């Protein structure tokens, strides 16, 4: 175990936000929802916090020092050897953005409902995963990340990014630069993903599923506009290790979404985006 100090990074539930945050809104929602739907929100809430309590109990029983942190605000992971996330993939991805060399263990607090593809842990197997971590026998999955550079500012991404107009109903206009080719395009946006993200949105857009530990990235424009004179060549493909792809915004209100919707970077007319493989992969504790 590289460090005995653990950061416990957890989410609040939909029940917290919609039913416990304000009495007036809670009363309105309870009138609108069917009893079985309301029960599902409550059951999910209770299961999440039961899992969180179980994780804390296991940490205390093994004498592990830890600090709790609720997602939604910036945090400093330095000084922690392990970050444990309790929630689903959204919680995992939010924590992962800040990590630089730390190990991360995802615990899916509701495997029946929550997507937890990056989460090796559950309420049932967490104690065993923790025991192996303490003994130095954990299986570590090294996942490649990509580096995003927008206007000379750099950001990491584990899953994928979407370059598009800020309105989903508006056309996205941009210029792609890849392997010596430059092409202006009109579409619904461009997906760029890592291997870890290749089973998600980019797959639905027509991309390929890559081996989990592949060092390649891939890009895929979505819903290219096929009007007059729009014979496109850069319709998607792999970005090899050592290569990069650049996109220049031709939109007044363009954006770059990083690993979901929580991180949204302005991408106004003339802005340049450069994407390549990051030299800082993520160390994930696995089953």
Functional labels for PLM-detected ranges:
Residues 2-12, 17-18, 27-31, 35-36, ...:
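Catalytic phosphate-donor-binding core of small-molecule kinases
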Residues 81-82:
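Structural motif
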Residues 85-86, 106, 192-193:
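Redox-cofactor binding/interface segments in oxidoreductases and associated redox assembly factors
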Residues 91-96, 198-203:
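Short glycine/serine/threonine-rich phosphate/pyrophosphate-binding segments
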Residues 96-110:
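A short, gly/pro- and small-residue-rich
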Residues 109, 195-198:
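Conformational gate/switch positions in structured elements
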């Amino acid at each position: 175990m590289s460090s005995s100090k653990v950061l416990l990074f957890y989410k609040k539930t939909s029940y917290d936000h919609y039913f416990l945050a304000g009495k007036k809104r809670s009363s309105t929602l309870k009138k609108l929802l069917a009893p079985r739907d309301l029960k599902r929100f409550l059951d999910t809430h209770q299961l999440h916090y039961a899992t969180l309590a179980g994780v804390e109990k296991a940490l205390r029983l093994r004498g592990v020092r830890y600090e709790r942190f609720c997602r939604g605000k910036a945090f400093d992971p330095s000084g922690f050897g392990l970050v444990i996330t309790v929630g689903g993939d959204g919680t995992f991805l939010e924590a992962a953005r800040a990590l630089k060399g730390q190990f991360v263990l995802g615990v899916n607090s509701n495997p029946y409902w929550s997507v937890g593809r990056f989460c090796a842990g559950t309420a049932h197997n967490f104690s065993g995963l923790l025991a192996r971590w303490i003994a130095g026998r954990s299986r570590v999955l090294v996942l490649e990340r990509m580096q995003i550079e927008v206007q000379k500012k750099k950001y990491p991404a584990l899953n994928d990014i979407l370059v598009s107009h800020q309105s989903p109903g508006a056309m996205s206009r941009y210029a792609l630069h890849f392997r010596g080719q430059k092409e202006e395009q009109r579409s619904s946006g461009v997906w760029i993903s890592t291997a870890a993200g290749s089973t998600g949105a980019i797959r639905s857009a027509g991309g390929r599923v890559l081996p989990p530990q592949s060092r390649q990235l891939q890009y895929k424009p979505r819903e290219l506009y096929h009007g007059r004179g729009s014979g496109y060549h850069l319709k998607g493909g792999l970005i090899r290790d050592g290569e990069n792809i650049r996109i220049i915004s031709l939109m007044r209100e363009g954006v770059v979404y990083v690993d979901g919707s929580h991180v949204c970077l302005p991408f106004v007319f003339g802005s340049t985006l450069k994407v390549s493989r990051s030299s800082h992969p993520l160390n994930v504790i696995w089953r």
